[in-house]
């Protein structure tokens, strides 16, 4: 029994010595585990660097987008607006001026129905930030609406629109703003924008490249949801209208634009104050174009981008009552 235990102990001792010698030998061998460790460390370093860059980007304020320069080749839109003194005049003109301010390369020709410019309109134009020309001409008494007459009985704004056409043709008359007319050869388009309508800025994109006379529908006019040209195969073949459809050009004043070179080439083309009711637009267009040559815009006249809106006349009963008591609103406050 002792012999056997001695042998077991000896065997255990020899195996232990062999294992120890093997371990000592392995400690002296080169290790190939360093390259993976170096690669992992580099990946961590790159991730830390990327995180630092992202944190710096988040702290940096966003860059202000650069405004593209206004292309000089873009034709100018000359917007002719007749206006007259009334309680809602300033409100109408503020709304219109802020729409026009969204349109690049636009020149506003604002024509007062007055002998001379008024401070209200002069101040509004100066504050508008628009390129403008201020004109004034009084409507003759024989052409003015009489008390109680509806607005459609007599054509309105005739003298004022013709005054603006005269200025474009170099006949002067400006009382404020830009006083020199466009030089010969100027590419542009002329649009007649009443001060009480509602305009989408998309409308001005549609008209800008007019070659002759461009046309489109007008909403809320003529007792209809809209009036406008009927188009087939890209050409105007008729008009959707209910009142006197046989007029030469059954269009609303807001429903067309004219190329400036065409107007300048036809010096006698203007609005006729003696034209029959509803024929004012035709009195100008008949000098400029044949109906078959009209240029349909607004997706072949299927989009309404201008509306013939009207601001309700304010009721001033309380104001009149206070005025009789000597307590009316301060007249020095412009409304």
Curated annotation (Swiss-Prot):
Intracellular or extracellular location(s): Golgi apparatus membrane; Golgi apparatus, cis-Golgi network
Composition skew (Basic and acidic residues), residue ranges: 312-322
Ranges facing Lumenal side: 29-335
SUPFAM superfamilies referenced in this protein's UniProt entry, alphabetically: Nucleotide-diphospho-sugar transferases
Residues where Mn(2+) binds: 196
Membrane spanning stretches: 8-28
Domain of life of the native organism: Eukaryota
Single GO BP term: positive regulation of catalytic activity
Names of the cofactor(s): Mn(2+)
Keyword terms, alphabetized: Disulfide bond, Glycoprotein, Golgi apparatus, Manganese, Membrane, Metal-binding, Signal-anchor, Transferase, Transmembrane, Transmembrane helix
GO cellular component, one term: Golgi membrane
Residues listed as glycosylation sites in the UniProt record: 300
EC number: 2.4.1.135
Signal peptide: none
Pathway: Protein modification; protein glycosylation
Xref: Pfam families: Glyco_transf_43
CDD domains linked: GlcAT-I
Record family assignment: Belongs to the glycosyltransferase 43 family.
Description of how the protein assembles with itself and partners: Homodimer; disulfide-linked. Interacts with PXYLP1; the interaction increases the 2-phosphoxylose phosphatase activity of PXYLP1 during completion of linkage region formation in a B3GAT3-mediated manner.
Function noted in UniProt: Glycosaminoglycans biosynthesis. Involved in forming the linkage tetrasaccharide present in heparan sulfate and chondroitin sulfate. Transfers a glucuronic acid moiety from the uridine diphosphate-glucuronic acid (UDP-GlcUA) to the common linkage region trisaccharide Gal-beta-1,3-Gal-beta-1,4-Xyl covalently bound to a Ser residue at the glycosaminylglycan attachment site of proteoglycans. Can also play a role in the biosynthesis of l2/HNK-1 carbohydrate epitope on glycoproteins. Highest activity seen with Gal-beta-1,3-Gal-beta-O-R (where R=naphthalenemethanol or benzyl alcohol).
Name the record gives this protein: Galactosylgalactosylxylosylprotein 3-beta-glucuronosyltransferase 3
Organism for this UniProt entry: Cricetulus griseus (Chinese hamster)
